[in-house]
Design a protein with these regions (language model features):
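Short, structured surface patches at the beginning of a domain
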Residues: 1-139
Length: 139
């Protein structure tokens, strides 16, 4: 088991346009936030182009989720995003992506200090659609 008690942050973003200026601003905000809170950075995963516009096909999100799940075995892990809309602009789909992060063993946190960590007393955005584990219907 790891002796490092600092959370391991997995940066995620999506960007549809060829111009990357605003993407770099968002990633720099993640870097600064992680440094301020002393989070160790696992890496950056960015879905680009059509993948960034889809809520169904996110290969970089899936790769990040696999890495996050693997690391969650012996580390505290989180997905760090610049804002909730980096997952999806649709509140329901945003909740779906957050649920997947939760099921992989992590939580989601924004560079403005909002998170969905279980038991957290930090603020949550009103636009961060809540997720719930819904039991499967009996057959």
């Amino acid at each position: 088991m790891s002796t490092n008690n600092q959370p391991l942050a997995f940066f995620y973003d999506r960007h549809a346009t060829p111009s990357t200026g605003i993407l770099q601003v968002r990633l720099e905000a993640c870097r600064e936030y992680a440094a301020e809170l002393r989070y160790e950075v696992a890496g950056e995963w960015i879905d680009r182009g059509d993948d960034a516009l889809s809520d169904d096909r996110r290969p970089q999100f899936d790769a990040m989720l696999d890495a996050l799940a693997g690391a969650s075995v012996d580390r505290t892990v989180l997905c760090l995003i610049n804002g909730w809309d980096r997952l999806s602009r649709d509140p329901g789909r945003c909740g779906h992506f957050r649920y997947r992060i939760h099921m992989a063993g992590g939580w989601t946190e924004t560079t403005t200090g909002e998170d969905d960590r279980p038991g957290s007393t930090r603020p949550r955005a009103l636009t961060a659609f809540p997720f719930a584990v819904v039991p499967e219907a009996a057959s």
